[in-house]
Regions:
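Expand to "…catalyze enediolate/carbanion chemistry for C-C bond making/breaking, isomerization
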Residues: 1-289, 293, 299-320
């Protein structure tokens, strides 16, 4: 399983709901997003762009990232959104590109933002049959593309499927495999039943076990459960501590921990897990990355990510 604090959860706030901006930043979501797309009626798009600028000027928690979902780039509003964003005083950390169907969508967004937003990165929302088919190419669209987001509602309507986990399992698996193959993150679609926390727990657990990094929330009450599901429990953290301790003791040579053979990839993944989720362990010193030997997985693309952003892959006790 992969764990990261980069995108366990995302909470969307309509651009017109200015009174909710502050709460969004303080919600506990890893990504606080203002929405210019579905939640804004066509007649108020320009007003929404003006209001959304204030979303990025508000104080946020040190771990939260700010994001904006633009309109689809197949119409004029998407480009208008990007032109407006490029002029914002404070730039967003992330731009979500909806209805992504080819790498060209990411290229257009990067070109429109230009030199005005050099640090802004992208998440591509894959939510059409063509987007699912082209997901591998979209995921590899460039170093500013940080992940794929599965959009279940639009995809379901497009193919005529049921909005259920079983019916959409193939599409979800393709999104995850495409993202992981390119070394980027994968976020699952929302669970739309706001009051059904048991259903959310089940679906979030399935998404985690599928390989997703996190899940979109449609209501703040979903965030705590989503963050918990996509974070390691104490048992996994304790195992990571034992793996790191064994690596320090053996000089990071191959050894056995809890009956499982572990080597360099295990040491590095356990180290990252502790650095991200167990900050009370200052006694575990950061270790430099050592290039892997042939046949041994190395750090994926995304090793340029800031400290604490890269995913952490920890095998379970039963894995060999």
């Amino acid at each position: 399983m992969k764990f990261t604090r980069y995108c366990r959860s995302l909470l969307s706030t309509p651009a017109m709901a200015v009174e909710r901006y502050t709460k969004s930043h303080q919600s506990g979501a890893d990504i606080a997003m203002v929405d210019l797309e579905d939640s804004v009626p066509p007649a108020r798009k320009e007003e929404a762009r003006r209001l959304a600028e204030e979303f990025f000027a508000l104080p946020s928690t040190k771990l939260a990232r700010s994001a904006v979902r633009i309109n689809t780039l197949s119409g004029p509003d998407g480009l208008r959104d990007l032109i407006a964003i490029a002029r914002y005083r404070v730039k967003p950390d992330l731009v979500l590109i909806p209805m992504a169907e080819s790498p060209r969508d990411i290229e257009i967004a990067a070109g429109a933002l230009g030199a005005d937003c050099p640090e802004t990165e992208f998440l591509a929302v894959v939510e059409t049959p063509l987007g699912i088919e082209h997901a591998p190419a979209i995921a590899a669209a460039g170093h500013r593309l940080r992940g794929l987001v599965f959009g279940s509602a639009d995809y379901t309507f497009a193919v005529g499927a049921r909005l259920s986990w079983e019916a959409l399992a193939h599409a979800r698996a393709r999104v995850v495999n495409s993202a992981r193959g390119a070394g980027v993150e994968a976020m699952d679609a929302p669970f739309f039943e706001v009051t059904d926390l048991a259903g959310l727990r089940r679906e979030a657990g399935l998404a985690r076990d599928f390989g997703f990094s996190g899940k979109i929330a449609v209501h703040p009450r979903q965030l705590a459960l989503i963050n918990e599901t996509f974070s390691p429990d104490e048992e996994l953290l304790e195992r990571a501590r034992r793996v790191v301790a064994a690596g320090l003791e053996t000089g990071r040579s191959v050894t056995v921990v809890d009956g499982v053979m572990v080597g360099m990839p295990f040491f590095e993944a356990s180290q990252r897990l502790i650095e991200q989720f167990d900050p009370a362990r200052p006694d575990v010193p950061p270790q430099p990355h050592v290039p892997s030997q042939p046949g041994v997985p190395s750090q994926p693309r995304g090793s340029h990510h800031p400290q604490g952003d890269s995913p952490t892959d920890i095998p379970t006790m039963t894995e060999k």
